[in-house]
Amino acid sequence: MTQVLRAALTDQPIFLAEHEELVSHRSAGAIVGFVGMIRDRDGGRGVLRLEYSAHPSAAQVLADLVAEVAEESSGVRAVAASHRIGVLQVGEAALVAAVAADHRRAAFGTCAHLVETIKARLPVWKHQFFEDGTDEWVGSV
């Protein structure tokens, strides 16, 4: 049975190393991590910052999504994921996920599935602010 060691929606900085340490397991032959970073350009425009807002149910939705992916996994020891909300600057992590598994294929596959599931179904909204003074909402679910 796969352990869910973190499923957090937070306004505090998140770090891959912390998630990797959480999922570390003596029986795991692989740990795979993912960091979704705030980049400095989008659509050819310079990005100043992003602001993530979330539906009131988002923390529970995230917990449910991580548990769902964990339950579907095979050969996976532990998973952890966190998503930021609030104001994020270029270079900060918006989404962090880590998976410990018996073998690399399960670790890579489960981590990719976890990230894609969160991106597709978590009710968060991204508001981008650009260097040219414009802004836009992106990726509403």
Curated annotation (Swiss-Prot):
Pfam families registered for this protein in UniProt: MoaE
InterPro entries given in the database record: MoaE_sf, Mopterin_biosynth_MoaE
Top-level taxon of origin: Bacteria
E.C. numbers: 2.8.1.12
Binding positions (substrate): 37-39, 103-104, 119, 126-128
Example of a GO cellular component annotation carried by this entry: cytosol
GO molecular function: molybdopterin synthase activity
GO biological process, one term: Mo-molybdopterin cofactor biosynthetic process
Catalysis performed (reactions): 2 [molybdopterin-synthase sulfur-carrier protein]-C-terminal-Gly-aminoethanethioate + cyclic pyranopterin phosphate + H2O = molybdopterin + 2 [molybdopterin-synthase sulfur-carrier protein]-C-terminal Gly-Gly + 2 H(+)
Subunit-level organization: Heterotetramer of 2 MoaD subunits and 2 MoaE subunits. Also stable as homodimer. The enzyme changes between these two forms during catalysis.
Purpose: Converts molybdopterin precursor Z into molybdopterin. This requires the incorporation of two sulfur atoms into precursor Z to generate a dithiolene group. The sulfur is provided by MoaD.
Protein name, as recorded: Molybdopterin synthase catalytic subunit 2
